[in-house]
Amino acid sequence: MVKLLHLLVFVVSLILSCEDSSNNDYGTLNFDMRLDSDANGFYHLSLSNDNWQTLHRVSAIIKDKDDQPVENFWMEWDSNLYWYLGDILGYVIKRGLTDELVYVSYDTVYITGFNGMEVPTSNQISYSNSKGELNNMIAPVRSMAGDTLYLTARWLGGNSATFSIVLD
């Protein structure tokens, strides 16, 4: 009985002495879209006419309550836009040398089997570096011109922020 009482006291004191590590230990989180915004708060990204995808970096800076950078801060990202791969992703040209040491192309192999594969327009996860910087790449494609990409960032405690990016 005494052992049971000691065990109970130990377990209760252990439970009461534990800290809640889910508290928001950060002070500020500032996003930098690196885009101009209009009067309605929509950001505008000009799509490339020379490439299928337009790559663009979105950043955020996270600092604690003492204005120090927070390292290894986890952030999840998602977007409302996706695109689909066709049947052929690309090709490889096999080249060799002749007896005269001249390059010749003797075969082309097509990389297939990706038909219908869904491709997101945003990376999914990022962690802050030692400077508190978080980075995410978005990559809309030309066929999305005129659409609005809604980029959502989610982090600790169920917090989130959504940014509207018009694809021009």
Regions found by a protein language model. Name each.
Residues 18-168:
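The feature marks long extracellular or luminal low-complexity segments
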